[in-house]
Amino acid sequence: MNWHDLNRLHVVSNLKKILGKWFSLDCIFLDEKGRVKTNFLEENHTLYSDFFKNQVSSLSGREHFNSDLESVYNLLINTEGGIQIYPSSFESINFVCCNLVYENKIMGSVVGYPFVFNNKSESLEKLINDLMSEWKIDLVQIQKTITSLKVSDNNLEYLKDLISLVSQEVITFHEEINEREERIKDLSSELGSRFRFHTMIGKSANMKKIYRLLEKVSSSEA
């Protein structure tokens, strides 16, 4: 899987943007071994979730996230397919995931985070306040995070459809790359068999001169 090109794919970037604006979550890719293949810590990488942005800005927050992600991966590799929802270590905050399956083989996963089911509960606000204080986030950012999670749409079916669309685009991209590589390989093989030295035909005077020299060399014992 060409993760570098995949992360820059126009249609995937647009779907990530829609997921970010509608659901205030970020979309992350894992490879078949559960390693993160989205460079969300890079300075120029756009994060749509204020919660996630604040979480990964803190060492303890990143440790929490990596631990949760490992648990999610271990659950994902044992599922047959479809959209899966797994809880994080924080109450009400979840992962929405889908395996990337190509020719019956898991090539990686798409992970949406964070998704909140009960975003109107008072306990959520307390949770965010406690976590952000632990991560040393200022009060303005805390309030912004609470607001972003509270306005997040709870329409799970739309979210599932979008995550599924991301996975389909990833597999389509992978298929096209594989087909292109196979065509190049076949073409190289065909050209190799058709244009050997003895079948090469050159009509220019210089090419004919080279052929005559090559024939002399090829027939000599040296």
List where the protein language model places each region:
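Juxtadomain coupling helices with adjacent low-complexity linkers
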Residues: 1-23, 79, 108-185
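Structured interaction and signal-relay segments at domain junctions
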Residues: 3-8, 12-92
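Residue-level signal for well-ordered, solvent-exposed loop/turn and beta-edge residues enriched
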Residues: 35, 104-105
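A short beta-strand signature within small-molecule sensing/ligand-binding domains used
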Residues: 83-84, 89-100, 106-117, 125-127
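AAA+ ATPase active-site-proximal loops
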Residues: 191-222
